Regions:
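Single conserved hydrophobic/aromatic residue that forms the stacking wall/gate
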Residues: 1-9
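Conserved alpha-helix/loop element of class I SAM-dependent methyltransferases that forms part
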Residues: 20-36
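Conserved class I S-adenosyl-L-methionine
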Residues: 35-44
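Conserved SAM-dependent methyltransferase scaffold
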Residues: 49-53
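Helix-to-beta-strand junctions that scaffold the AdoMet/dcAdoMet cofactor pocket
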Residues: 60-61, 188-189
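S-adenosyl-L-methionine
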Residues: 79-127
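Mobile active-site "lid"/loop adjacent to the S-adenosyl-L-methionine
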Residues: 128-183, 201-204, 216, 227
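C-terminal catalytic and target-recognition region of SAM-dependent MTase-like enzymes
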Residues: 194-267
Length: 267
């Protein structure tokens, strides 16, 4: 989605978000339906939460923000542990979502450290409380490094993302990611779906994390769909949207990513 964000003057809500298509694809793979209880575990800055809200309340638009359906009890809980990112998340959701959703308690924002063993007890719906969970985990962020490199080429200066990156980040991040994945699984209802995603290029943060999780949680079911190969490279457990991926049967490259994601279902 590459449109300039616009504001609906009457209701002071923004109508567009510039979000990488791979991020939209990962959110769509959750198969969110009206009436679901959804948790966006690491939600800042908020683009994916807004994408999920569009699926939960398809009848709401920026120019008709008060038309909240009462025929289904959709719930969206957006969580972020970092204080600065939490403030940004809150500001963005207020800028895009009708106030009525928060006023009625249908959308809630929380600050919970989801790596804690007790985290699942602190979520509003608790253990096994959510039909769908999106875990866009913090990572070593090579995707942002690539974007920073392109900006640095244009400006001639090193971006903060490039200066902060270290080769050992993947090893430490994978431990955090596995803890987050286990918390997300505990919060998922039987029959529910979870999408684990990162913008890292490192297998240590992607399939390696999923492999470690499946070793301790063998009942988890990895979901596959043939349609994704038109947009992504298939990996052992998930999919990789890469900007140099050649779309099968064409001479076109995918303009999205990089983003890794894996779909898991709880029996």
């Amino acid at each position: 989605l590459r449109r300039q964000r616009q504001m609906c003057i009457r209701d002071s809500l923004y109508t567009h978000w510039n979000l990488d298509g791979a991020s939209v694809l990962a959110a769509q793979c959750l198969d969110v339906q009206p009436g679901h209880a959804v948790l966006d575990l690491c939600a800042a800055p908020g683009g994916k939460s807004i994408t999920l809200a569009q699926k939960l309340w398809p009848e709401l638009y920026a120019d008709h923000p008060s038309r909240t359906s009462t025929t289904h009890a959709s719930i969206l809980h957006s969580n972020e542990v970092d204080p600065a990112r939490l403030r940004r998340l809150h500001a963005n959701l207020k800028s895009y979502l009708p106030n009525t959703l928060m006023d009625q308690g249908l959308v809630e924002i929380s600050r919970i450290d989801a790596t804690s063993p007790r985290a699942v007890q602190l979520f509003p719906l608790g253990e096994k409380g959510y039909d769908r969970i999106l875990l866009d985990a913090p990572c070593s962020s090579e995707r942002h490094i690539l974007h920073a490199y392109m900006r640095a080429q244009q400006s001639g200066t090193a971006a903060p993302e490039m200066l902060a990156w270290k080769p050992t980040m993947s090893r430490s991040m994978s431990k955090t990611q596995l803890a987050l994945l286990r918390t997300a699984w505990a919060a998922l209802r039987p029959g529910g779906r979870l999408v684990y995603a990162t913008c890292s290029l490192s297998e240590q943060e992607n399939d390696h994390v999923v492999r470690a999780f499946l070793t301790s949680t063998p009942e988890a079911h990895v979901l596959r769909t043939d349609s994704l190969v038109h947009f992504c490279q298939q990996t052992e457990y998930g999919y990789f949207a890469l900007p140099d991926y050649m779309i099968p049967g064409t001479e076109q490259r995918s303009p999205w990513g990089p983003l890794y994601f894996c779909m898991l279902e709880k029996p």
